[in-house]
């Protein structure tokens, strides 16, 4: 049964007009459903029919918003990257370096823990050579990382952080925070039910923040 709100038919998401509120809601429903399907089955193993079923939407209604499976897949990945870039963009060059990095790491950990499917989907895309979002990585992502690397380098030059290569610091933050989503099965195999125990997320954040931030605090 199609449980989405019916579109009016007067405006097409494929056109240049601003989407209506109903269209925006249905688009989010599709992207959420597609994320779950793609993260489990991968791009090749997923079908539009599976996504439509997950979204509780008819296939023709879904195809009104996205013409092809490839279009849905790209939209899901770009939506994920937009969310991930937001806390990096928010890093303030005029703020306290340790606190700015603390906020960034905390936000990245929360994203991995709250939406592990998105992290795993992105990891699979990159492992496949980023055939869909390679241009995004080489342009928008690179441009933002270059800007924030200069911010970190300025903090180091002013003695507000210990000497560290800004790119490797950013890579380390990504690797550490996304590990808890991408390698959830491995973590559960080692620590078992502790993963779901109260306080595990806080312990994770405390450990990661302690290691990273203590490693880059200015030396006396």
Question: What do these predicted regions represent?
Answer:
Residues 26, 69, 76, 80, ...:
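Hydrophobic/aromatic residues within well-ordered alpha-helical segments
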């Amino acid at each position: 049964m199609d449980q989405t709100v019916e579109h009016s038919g007067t405006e097409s998401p494929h056109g240049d007009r601003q989407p209506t509120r109903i269209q925006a809601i249905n688009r989010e429903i599709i992207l959420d459903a597609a994320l779950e399907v793609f993260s489990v089955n991968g791009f090749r193993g997923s079908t539009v029919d599976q996504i439509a079923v997950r979204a509780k939407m008819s296939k023709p209604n879904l195809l009104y918003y996205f013409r092809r499976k490839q279009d849905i897949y790209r939209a899901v990945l770009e939506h994920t990257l937009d969310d991930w870039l937001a806390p990096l963009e928010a890093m303030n060059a005029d703020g306290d370096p340790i606190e700015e990095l603390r906020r960034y790491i905390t936000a990245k950990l929360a994203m991995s823990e709250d939406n592990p499917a998105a992290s795993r989907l992105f990891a699979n895309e990159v492992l496949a050579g980023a055939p869909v979002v390679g241009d995004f990585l080489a342009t928008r992502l690179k441009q933002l990382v270059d800007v924030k690397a200069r911010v970190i380098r300025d903090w180091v030059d002013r003695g507000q952080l210990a000497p560290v290569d800004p790119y490797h610091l950013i890579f380390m933050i990504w690797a550490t925070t996304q590990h808890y989503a991408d390698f959830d099965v491995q973590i559960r195999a080692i620590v078992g039910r502790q993963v779901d125990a109260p306080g595990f997320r806080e312990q994770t954040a405390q450990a990661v923040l302690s290691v990273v931030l203590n490693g880059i605090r200015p030396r006396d």
